[in-house]
Amino acid sequence: MANNNLKKLLLSPISDNNPIALQILGICSALAVTTQLQTAFVMAIAVSLVTAFSSMFISMIRNYIPNSIRIIVQMAIIASLVILVDQILRAYVYDLSKQLSVFVGLIITNCIVMGRAEAFAMKSAPLESFVDGIGNGLGYGAMLVIVAFLRELIGSGKIFGVTVLQTIQDGGWYQANGLFLLAPSAFFIIGFVIWAIRTWKPEQVEK
């Protein structure tokens, strides 16, 4: 029974309760870091780790946090983990860290991270909170990867920086669509994905 609950916590945010597609959270970073698959993957991993470990740590001390300062404590824990992730990125993948710019630091204010801490971790056991954090990170990351895949492929004819569709400028046949390298294109793609998910799962349509 416990395993089934953990499995549901892990898998539900990917399709049934996706943070971006259903809850409409984390949109800003979905627009900013999805021009390339590489940055989208790194951002997805960073958010997943921060959400999982912050939820676990908050759950472990939830009975000792005064209600009046719980948000401050949550933000302090989240901020500490974000700083750690940012420093690791700067140390080992500096170029990617520069591409992600301020958006790693802005994980602190990401509604998904704060939302899971407040709505779930404050009421649940550490293991469940950790799995819930991983699940929501995967759901967020799945949307980022879908958006980044389409934007990079259509916008530049590349995947992970490797040419897949030879552009006219390089002597090929494909005319790259520069619109997909601009942030507004992510809105259209996210909207299309939301439509596709709700066509597949009609129960997600608001009444």
From Swiss-Prot:
Protein's membrane topology: Multi-pass membrane protein
Reactions catalysed according to its record: a ubiquinone + n Na(+)(in) + NADH + H(+) = a ubiquinol + n Na(+)(out) + NAD(+)
EC number: 7.2.1.1
Compartment list: Cell inner membrane
GO CC term, one of those recorded: plasma membrane
Membrane-spanning parts: 20-40, 41-61, 69-89, 102-122, 130-150, 177-197
Keywords tagged on the record: Cell inner membrane, Cell membrane, Ion transport, Membrane, NAD, Sodium, Sodium transport, Translocase, Transmembrane, Transmembrane helix, Transport, Ubiquinone
A biological-process GO annotation: sodium ion transport
Molecular function terms from GO: oxidoreductase activity, acting on NAD(P)H, quinone or similar compound as acceptor
InterPro entries per record: NqrD, NqrDE/RnfAE
Main location: membrane
Assembly and interaction partners: Composed of six subunits; NqrA, NqrB, NqrC, NqrD, NqrE and NqrF.
Annotated family: Belongs to the NqrDE/RnfAE family.
PANTHER family per record: ELECTRON TRANSPORT COMPLEX PROTEIN RNFE, NA(+)-TRANSLOCATING NADH-QUINONE REDUCTASE SUBUNIT D
Record function comment: NQR complex catalyzes the reduction of ubiquinone-1 to ubiquinol by two successive reactions, coupled with the transport of Na(+) ions from the cytoplasm to the periplasm. NqrA to NqrE are probably involved in the second step, the conversion of ubisemiquinone to ubiquinol.
Name of the molecule in the record: Na(+)-translocating NADH-quinone reductase subunit D
Organism encoding this protein: Haemophilus ducreyi (strain 35000HP / ATCC 700724)
